[in-house]
Amino acid sequence: MLDIAMPKIEVVTAAENYGRFKIEPLDPGYGHTLGNALRRVLLSSIPGAAITKIKIEGVFHEFSTIPGVKEDVTEIVLNIKGIRLRSYAERPVKISLSKRGAGVVRAADIDAPSNVEIVNPNHYICTIDRDDAAIDMEMTVERGRGYLPADQRDALPIGEIPIDAIFTPVPKVNYVVEHIRVGQATDIDSLLIEIWTDGTIKPGDALSHAAQVLVQYSQTIADFNRLSTEAEPTTAPNGLAIPADIYDTPIEELDLSTRTYNCLKRADITKVGQVLEMDEKALLSVRNLGQKSMEEIRDKLIERGYIPRIGQTSHAARAEIEG
């Protein structure tokens, strides 16, 4: 295998929510290869925290109004989506807001535990325009990746309002590839990548995390031949063996809805084999994964031949039983 010259990384600009990084020298074509891959991972796979639902005292749905508050609930929800925070807890965390009397309500008025940090305390939420008015609100903070629409979650109790959760802390990434001269070669790539964050993560840390994600996926591919020859079939609860190639299939291959996919990912269920090892009771115990999502998973597994239809035995299952 030919050696690949390792590039150097230079920090061109380093700020709290903006960074420019130069990576060079790169073999011809590798500027776009790395730049595009890093950009996609930065925009989709960096973990973050967001408010996923709220409950306002005296309010039963998002189309309500609050006496003495200038904005209606729909506007308040839109403003809350802009609150950026860090959560150091693995589980959902409750934060609260209680404000009385005329005045502007900002993110700084939120009462949060020590494991939640609000990074834009001056963010505007609403205005109370009467001295005898008040707003009391409870919010739920969760960690996740990417974007989770409010309409792709299981039904909530009356009074709890779901919010589109923007988990990603990296809203924008640009990259430029230029040719530089190294010795006699004039077609060497130089990659300049710009990263904007929401302040909850430093651009350099985001770049490092994105690279680690790519390394993990690449390592799996690099180890493919060794793992495929060494791996022993896994046995599911129904007693049938799960071949290694099926076990290691990413759940993305099931083409699940965003809601169901995010439920599994948050529970660290990333492979089809992990799903096949779980019975219905175990699946329903996954947070926010309800009966509808469980049935969707079952239908997708049947559709791809991983499990037999009810009342039928698949070819693989029949061969296993007869053997």
Curated annotation (Swiss-Prot):
SUPFAM superfamilies: C-terminal domain of RNA polymerase alpha subunit (SSF47789), Insert subdomain of RNA polymerase alpha subunit (SSF56553), RBP11-like subunits of RNA polymerase (SSF55257)
Family matches, as InterPro entries: DNA-dir_RNA_pol_insert (IPR011262), DNA-dir_RNA_pol_RpoA/D/Rpb3 (IPR011263), DNA-dir_RpoA (IPR011773), RBP11-like (IPR036603), RNAP_asu_C (IPR011260), RNApol_insert_sf (IPR036643)
CDD domains: RNAP_alpha_NTD (cd06928)
Key words, A-Z: DNA-directed RNA polymerase, Nucleotidyltransferase, Transcription, Transferase
Annotated region (Alpha N-terminal domain (alpha-NTD)), positions in chain: 1-225
Region of interest (Alpha C-terminal domain (alpha-CTD)), residue spans: 246-323
Entry superkingdom: Bacteria
Enzyme class (EC, first level): transferase
A GO molecular-function annotation: DNA binding
GO cellular component: cytoplasm; DNA-directed RNA polymerase complex
Glycoprotein found in the keyword field: no
Record-listed E.C. numbers: 2.7.7.6
GO biological process, any: DNA-templated transcription
Catalytic activity, as annotated: RNA(n) + a ribonucleoside 5'-triphosphate = RNA(n+1) + diphosphate
Subunit structure: Homodimer. The RNAP catalytic core consists of 2 alpha, 1 beta, 1 beta' and 1 omega subunit. When a sigma factor is associated with the core the holoenzyme is formed, which can initiate transcription.
Family the UniProt entry places it in: Belongs to the RNA polymerase alpha chain family.
Function: DNA-dependent RNA polymerase catalyzes the transcription of DNA into RNA using the four ribonucleoside triphosphates as substrates.
NCBIfam families assigned: PRK05182.1-2 (NF003513), PRK05182.2-5 (NF003519), rpoA (TIGR02027)
Domain writeup: The N-terminal domain is essential for RNAP assembly and basal transcription, whereas the C-terminal domain is involved in interaction with transcriptional regulators and with upstream promoter elements.
Alphabetized HAMAP family for the sequence: RNApol_bact_RpoA
Annotated protein name in UniProt: DNA-directed RNA polymerase subunit alpha
Gene that specifies this protein: rpoA
